[in-house]
Amino acid sequence: MLRKVVLLRLCPLLGRPAVSASSGSRREVASGVPPSGSTSPRALNIFDRELKRKQKNWAARQPDPMKFDYLKEEVGSRIADRVYDIARDFPLALDIGCGRGYIAQHLDKETVGKIFQTDIAEHALKNSLETDIPTVNILADEEFLPFQENTFDLVVSSLSLHWVNDLPRALEQIHYVLKPDGVFVGAMFGGDTLYELRCSLQLAETEREGGFSPHISPFTAVNDLGHLLGRAGFNTLTVDTDEIQVNYPGMFELMEDLKGMGESNCSWNRKALLHRDTMLAAAAVYREMYRNEDGSIPATFQIYHMIGWKYHDSQARPAERGSATVSFGELAKLNDVMSHEKK
C-alpha cells in the first residue's frame, strides 16, 4: 500500500507547541551505550554513530527546534494511529530512538500506562516534549538495549533505525525485550527518500568535478525489511510504504532543514566538502528537473511502516500443510456447477 501526502515547509502539522518536560519525567544514563566503535562482528560499519549523536544533540539545542519537527511529528502521529488500531492496552511501552518524544505526545495514558524513551543524544532527551504518560528517559543505543528479556508490551520506533549499523541486531534486541504477544510498531526512511536531491548532487558533481561521492546515506530496501523482521523472530508481519512530499523554496532550504532535524549524512565515506560552484549547479539542476508550478521544489521522504508480533500460544496460526479437507480443484468444480445452474 502506498500513500502520498504533500506538506509545506515550516507549516505546523498539528499545532502543538513544544513545552518543557513533564514533572513526572526523569532522565537516566543507562549502561546500554556501547564503547566507541563496538559493533557485532557481522555488522557493516557504514555510519559514524558518534557523529550522528553530535548531529542530533546540535539539533536539539537550537533555540527553536520545533521549527524542524514537522516531519518527525507527522510520522510519530502515524505510528500512534497504528497503535490505537490494535485496540488493546499496553501497561509498559518502549520508544527506541525517541528524539524529543515524537510518538509519546500522540499517545494517551488510557492506552499506554508507562513509557521508557531511549536515544543516543542526551540533549534530545533533556528537551523532550510533554506527555500525559508517565515517562522515563534513558540514554541508550538502539543496538544495545539495557533491558531484560520479556519486559515490554509494546515497542515503537520512528525514523531512527535507518541510522544503525547493525539493523538485524537492533531488530533482534527489540524482539528480545518484548513480552510474548507483544508488538513492535516502527517506521524508518526508505530507499527512495530524497531521490531528487541525490540525483541533482550526482549530476552537478559529475559535470563540475568529473565524478561523484555519496551525499545521501544508504537506506534499506523494502523487500529486505520483511525478511529481517522474520529472521529476528517476529511473526504476523505487516510492512507498508508511505510517501511524504515536502515543498521547499529551494535546495539550500531543504539542506538547512535536514541539518535542523539531525538528519545530515553521517556515513563514513561521505565527502567532507562540496565546492560552492558545484552546490550552485546542483540547486539549478534540482529546480530545472523537479520544480513545481509555484516555483518551489519537492523533496520526497519514503517511509517504511512495519508491525511485528512476538510469538504466543494464543495467537492464530496457519493450519499444517496437508490438513485441508477440500482441495482447490474441488472448489473450481463447485464454481462451474453454480455457473451452470444460473444459466
Curated annotation (Swiss-Prot):
Instruction: Answer yes or no on keyword Lyase.
Output: no
Q: What is its main location?
A: mitochondrion
Q: Which UniProt keywords apply?
A: Membrane, Methyltransferase, Mitochondrion, Mitochondrion inner membrane, Oxidoreductase, Transferase, Transit peptide
Q: Per the record, GO CC terms?
A: matrix side of mitochondrial inner membrane; mitochondrion
Gene3D superfamilies the record matches: Vaccinia Virus protein VP39
Q: Kindly state a single biological-process term from the GO annotations of this entry.
A: mitochondrial respiratory chain complex I assembly
GO molecular function terms noted in the UniProt entry: monooxygenase activity; S-adenosylmethionine-dependent methyltransferase activity
| This enzyme's EC code(s) | 1.-.-.-, 2.1.1.-
Q: Where is the transit peptide?
A: 1-29
- From the Swiss-Prot or TrEMBL record, state where the protein is found: Mitochondrion inner membrane
- Family matches, as InterPro entries: Malonyl-ACP_OMT, Methyltransf_11, SAM-dependent_MTases_sf
UniProt similarity note:
Belongs to the methyltransferase superfamily.
Biological role stated in the UniProt entry: Arginine hydroxylase that mediates hydroxylation of 'Arg-122' of NDUFS7 and is involved in the assembly of mitochondrial NADH:ubiquinone oxidoreductase complex (complex I, MT-ND1) at early stages. May also have methyltransferase activity.
How would you summarize the oligomeric state and partners of this protein? Interacts with NDUFAF8, leading to stabilize NDUFAF5. Interacts with NDUFS7. Interacts with PYURF (via TRM112 domain); the interaction is direct and stabilizes NDUFAF5 protein.
Q: What is this protein called?
A: Arginine-hydroxylase NDUFAF5, mitochondrial
The organism named in the record is Mus musculus (Mouse)
The lineage, from the top, is:
Eukaryota, Metazoa, Chordata, Craniata, Vertebrata
